[in-house]
Amino acid sequence: MILYQALSSYQILECIVHRQVYHREEKCILILGTYITERMPRYRELETKKLFDEVYLFRFGGYRGSEEKIIREVGEELRKTLPYDIRSFEKILAAGIHTYLQVYLISGKIPFEMFEDGSGALSRPWILAEIHRKSAPGRYSLIEQYGLYDHRSPLITKKYCDMRSQEPDFEDERAVDFQVMERFRELPERMQKEVRGVFDVPELEGEADAVLLLTQQFANLGQLSLEGQISIYRHLFDYYLRGRKVLIKPPSGRYPVL
């Protein structure tokens, strides 16, 4: 029995594809954050379409107090959420390891495998670490202490990543090349269609002249001012996208056509 964890849409896709490639015939459980009900209303289709055998919602946030108190409460929440002993899984694969759940696993000497947070992120751990250091310094301190930003914990046994997108001098003996989109395209067409449906991704046939703009929350994450973020998109439209049909994917996952 295999346990997957995902926090974002991209990470859910990583888990779906990995399961289809490596563990298609095994019983696979998926843990998502409770907030997924708003971000991904069709998340239950992950189970009904048999992309995973069972899906459970775990409260990743809202823990306060000392390190010992947080670890204890996370363990209690996990036992309420998951009808299995966490140690009964053959493998645990976590996408988005900067959480108190991974602190709990490491404190209990429970090994797990990880996925990078985005293409090329494994060799650039400072990006996410700096965002969290500014936005949640208390949480950052504890998670950094457990080696979850730079992935140095020896209990992380494998690190799935896009090797082509890493820094030129990147080396890690635990890194495993995992090209998410290439592997996705290798899946049967029926499976690809079902996955797109879960994410509400439209068919783009006949849109050869269209541009898909993938947006980021730079301002909300403290990486840019709101004015700076607006300036980026204004320059894109003024100098590169004028007269083009643009499909904008906001962080919410919707795809309006402008």
What label would you give each PLM region?
Residues 34, 118, 217-219, 252:
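Residue-level signal for short, function-critical loop segments
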Residues 131-218:
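A nucleotide-sugar donor-handling region in carbohydrate enzymes
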Residues 220-224:
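A generic structural signal for short coil/turn motifs at secondary-structure boundaries
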Residues 1-3:
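Extreme N-terminal starter segment of soluble prokaryotic enzymes
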Residues 240-258:
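Catalytic donor nucleotide-activated moiety binding site of glycosyltransferases and closely related
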Residues 5-151, 155:
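Active-site and donor-binding regions of nucleotide-sugar-utilizing enzymes
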Residues 19-21, 81-85, 198-207, 237-238:
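Short boundary motifs at domain starts and secondary-structure transition points
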